[in-house]
């Protein structure tokens, strides 16, 4: 009888532990890192609200899938590092899905936006082709598809590359004349010129073919979050929410 009672008590204890574990999982808050300024994907508006395409897509996906998250605006390099060391579970920051990133351990979601990269010059610049960059300097943001695009052309067209840690500083380097051009994701650049009044312009014919942005994790233990993102992304595409978000920021 005592043995039966002990077995029953053990079973009840196990049930209690499993129940508590389930409740803890249900209340999990996923930590998601993002950039500080990558308009229109993430930025602080005039009301001091952190907004953008990435911000709204994540919110819509989380609502659709019923998970909680803590979005932390850390900056690109700090956000990447946070995921790499496990201080954040995922990254959403206009991260281009690239083979080199996959090989280094990043695990990406389905693409949620296809972006091209473009060269950008000062408003009064006469540069209109890659050939015009010979002997000059092109500014890029560290770790971005824009940097990759510029590096893929620098030897062929004979220009140097200067690396910056954030987009605003990179833009200013071109405006001040230190760099002849910069290379940035096209939607980002178009929005910054339009809304920020930057004395920059986008020459025709100096644009890449483009690649998709993805939500990314590094720890395979966070696959559940990635699966929920993919499922939610599919649903918000189908119900029209996704297009409404794009229209809100890109039109």
Annotated model-derived regions:
Residues 16-19:
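C-terminal motif of bacterial Sec signal peptides marking the signal peptidase cleavage site
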Residues 22-26, 68, 145-162, 200-207, ...:
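Ligand-binding clefts/hinges and TM-proximal coupling segments of bilobed small-molecule sensing domains
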Residues 29-52:
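Short glycine-rich His-centered loop
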Residues 34-38, 72-77, 86-99, 123, ...:
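Beta->alpha turn/N-cap motifs
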Residues 36, 113-121, 190, 194-233, ...:
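Periplasmic-binding protein-like
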Residues 55, 59, 63, 68-132, ...:
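Acidic, polar ligand-binding/catalytic clefts
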Residues 68-75, 158-166, 173:
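Short beta-strand-to-loop elements that line the ligand-binding cleft
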Residues 81, 94-103, 151-152, 175-176, ...:
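A ligand-binding cleft/hinge motif common to bilobed small-molecule-binding domains
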